[in-house]
Amino acid sequence: MIVQDSVCSELMRGCEEILPVPELEKKLQKGIPLKIKAGFDPTAPDLHLGHTVLLNKLRQFQQFGHEVIFLIGDFTAMIGDPTGKNVTRMPLSQETVLENAKTYQHQVFKILDPDKTTVAFNSQWLNKFNAVDLIRLAATHTVARMLERDDFNKRYTTGQPIAIHEFLYPLLQGYDSVALKADVELGGTDQKFNLLMGRELQKHYGFEPQVVMMTPLIEGLDGVKKMSKSLDNYIGINETSEQMFGKIMSVSDELMWRYIDLLSFKTGKEIQQLKQSVLEGKNPRDVKIDFAKEIVARFHDQTQAEFAHNKFIERFQKGNIPEDLEELSLVIAEPIALAQLLKQIDLTASTSESIRMVKQGAVKVDGDKISDPSLKLPIGKSYIIQVGKRRIAKLSIQQAH
């Protein structure tokens, strides 16, 4: 069976980098189910939409008849992935890892087809490693090769400690591909070193090397930094339908297209048609509403998507002030610029975001749109402050004594 070029194009769409492309095309042209691997270390209990960029790609492979292996790195999670870290990461307990792993499985099957997914745990083979096995694995690579990794290199050159077990992490992750005989491995762009390690180790052990497909790291709600729970710029897949809908509606039109490209189940052709319709006069807000409904329906259901949409209209588009409005208090010695104030009460992540939101006309005080980020609100009064479509609070500004 010859795989159509359109199938190859659809599978490659949205990937940041594929190494190497000709090998992927060759594997797909064989017309037999490939083993598609993606590993997740359950270091936190909840997934967010940033994680689903990769899960969506796995789902595509399932739709085209390939075998998806959802690998839970229960063994490697106890080491801790050093990728992007400037300090040694503290290992997690086995109990925490297993509890998080249970939550992961429940969440991923909101996207993946459980009947077409093999769930594996790398403790199945790594727990069997003895000292000889580990030394032989470590002997496949040099310290110089490990220091090619940007994060290791930075820590080494600045005198920050690197624990020996951190060097073992990419080797163990790479060995997972050997154990599973993976044909393709998916991961984020930040995982490039680890993904290529799997390819190198497969060659070393005499297997056909896997193709590496890297998906982009999606920006968070601020449109600047990658989506992360620690930065509070994320959309969790376990959030309520109203929270999810509101957060999606809060993103800029520019970021909306980025989200649609990476998160929608629409084909590339359908997305191009959407973009063309906006160029021809369709309101981007309507596209955003449809996208928000799609995402909410995926993680809840269509009824909840319609409910969230109606609540959103009732709360924001009709100008209603919600009954459960968050009440904030700020005590200051003298009035401060609105841009600084918004950051101080956590309605924005930074002063620069405050300025950007004001300039976009996304900030209202008592229902009036504000155009001056340096505006100073008088002390001794209360205000209804709204930033974007979802962040709204009642603020009381009091005089410091």
UniProtKB/Swiss-Prot annotation:
E.C. no: 6.1.1.1
Protein's GO biological process: tyrosyl-tRNA aminoacylation
Top-rank taxon: Bacteria
Main location: cytoplasm
Motif 'KMSKS' region in this chain: 226-230
Cellular component, GO annotation: cytosol
Keyword DNA-binding: no
Compartment list: Cytoplasm
Binding, ATP: K229
Reaction(s) catalysed by this chain's protein: tRNA(Tyr) + L-tyrosine + ATP = L-tyrosyl-tRNA(Tyr) + AMP + diphosphate + H(+)
Entry keyword set: Aminoacyl-tRNA synthetase, ATP-binding, Cytoplasm, Ligase, Nucleotide-binding, Protein biosynthesis, RNA-binding
GO molecular function, one term: ATP binding
SMART domains (alphabetical): S4 (SM00363)
PROSITE patterns according to UniProt: AA_TRNA_LIGASE_I, S4
Motif ('HIGH' region): 42-51
Family to which the UniProt record says this protein belongs: Belongs to the class-I aminoacyl-tRNA synthetase family. TyrS type 2 subfamily.
Function (record text): Catalyzes the attachment of tyrosine to tRNA(Tyr) in a two-step reaction: tyrosine is first activated by ATP to form Tyr-AMP and then transferred to the acceptor end of tRNA(Tyr).
Subunit structure: Homodimer.
HAMAP family: Tyr_tRNA_synth_type2
Protein name (database record): Tyrosine--tRNA ligase
Gene name per UniProt: tyrS
